[in-house]
Design a protein with these regions (language model features):
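Substrate-binding/catalytic cleft of secreted carbohydrate-active enzymes
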Residues: 62-67, 74-194
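Secreted/periplasmic carbohydrate-active enzymes, especially glycoside hydrolases
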Residues: 1-94, 120-121, 135-136, 152, ...
């Protein structure tokens, strides 16, 4: 990707993209034409290591995220805020899907807090929209109002209209409000786990 000003290149960066086809319809999720069931982890966005902390090399992110893949997970639902670029790139490399939140609290919010959440969602979508591993944008850790869900979907539709990504919120099962329920909790409960 090249940034040009007045026809002259001023900055350049390698932009990697990947391709996949998704469909969220009729109560099913399809990836590349095949029905799948999300199964995986709700991971802290910091994804830190004991005694090392957050600043880990890329290979350690690949190793850590690879452990989830090796345990038969196919999705990571990051907690509360968008992950750092290194983890997004890692999941792109190893082929693990992710649900990306923008920023939330344990409930729907109003006023300036909601406006901030929308701003963070917009910025995260713009920054990560070329990452094929992101299959879902999460509006909140808990359900949000119908109006708020519509606003998040409008942000997605404006800044990532062809990305094939769902928009949803954890603990919000109304099909009329969202594309997919983001909570892995329901998969686990349906399998007899609590």
């Amino acid at each position: 990707t090249t940034l040009t000003i007045n026809g002259k290149p001023t900055d350049k960066v390698v932009t990697r993209t990947g391709f996949r086809q998704t469909e969220f319809a009729n109560g099913m999720v399809k990836l590349n034409g095949r029905v799948i069931q999300f199964k995986g982890y709700a991971q802290r966005t910091s994804n830190e290591w004991p005694a090392i902390g957050l600043s880990v090399p890329a290979w350690l992110s690949d190793y850590s995220n690879g452990q989830m893949l090796a345990s038969n997970a196919n999705l990571v639902r990051w907690m509360h805020t968008a992950p750092w670029k290194q983890d997004v790139d890692s999941l792109d490399r190893i082929g693990l899907m992710q649900a990306m939140p923008a920023g939330d609290s344990e409930a729907d919010v109003t006023g300036r807090r909601w406006e901030q959440r929308k701003e963070v969602m917009r910025d995260a979508i713009i920054y990560f929209r070329t990452s094929p591993s992101i299959v879902m944008y999460e509006a909140g850790n808990r359900g949000v109002s119908a109006e708020h869900m519509a606003e998040v979907k409008a942000i997605r539709d404006r800044y990532d209209p062809h990305g094939g990504r769902a928009a949803g919120s954890r603990e919000m099962l109304s099909k009329a409000l969202q594309d997919v329920a983001a909570g892995l909790i329901y998969v686990l409960a349906g399998a007899g786990f609590s």
